[in-house]
């Protein structure tokens, strides 16, 4: 199973995170399938590759709680629901 989760980058006391699609069994810093975004909590900056995220969500990827909150704030799930209604 694939999850959308945060991968820690940056230096000490100055963490930034990449949002990655990664296999559930691999560790946090393990090899990811694809980088789909970036999150800087200090500057409150977020970059999301929305088409890639929607593609992984349609294939059944599960976001972690923190990634879910980031995606919800960016209103990605509205687009996801619109895509779901078009196909059904």
Swiss-Prot record:
One of its GO terms (molecular function) is structural constituent of ribosome. Keywords: Chloroplast, Plastid, Ribonucleoprotein, Ribosomal protein. It holds the Pfam family Ribosomal_S16. Disulfide bonds: none annotated. The keyword Metal-binding does not apply. One of its GO terms (cellular component) is mitochondrion. Component of the chloroplast ribosome (chloro-ribosome), a dedicated translation machinery responsible for the synthesis of chloroplast genome-encoded proteins, including proteins of the transcription and translation machinery and components of the photosynthetic apparatus. Component of the chloroplast small ribosomal subunit (SSU). Mature 70S chloroplast ribosomes of higher plants consist of a small (30S) and a large (50S) subunit. The 30S small subunit contains 1 molecule of ribosomal RNA (16S rRNA) and 24 different proteins. The 50S large subunit contains 3 rRNA molecules (23S, 5S and 4.5S rRNA) and 33 different proteins. Belongs to the bacterial ribosomal protein bS16 family. This is Small ribosomal subunit protein bS16c. The gene is rps16.
């Amino acid at each position: 199973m694939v999850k959308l989760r945060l991968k820690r980058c940056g230096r000490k006391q100055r963490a930034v995170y990449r949002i990655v699609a990664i296999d559930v069994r691999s560790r946090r810093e393990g090899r990811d399938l694809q980088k789909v975004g970036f999150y800087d909590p200090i500057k409150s900056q977020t970059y999301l590759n929305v088409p890639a995220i929607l593609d992984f969500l349609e294939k059944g990827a599960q976001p972690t709680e923190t990634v879910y909150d980031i995606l919800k704030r960016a209103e990605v799930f509205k687009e996801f629901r619109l895509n779901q209604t078009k196909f059904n």
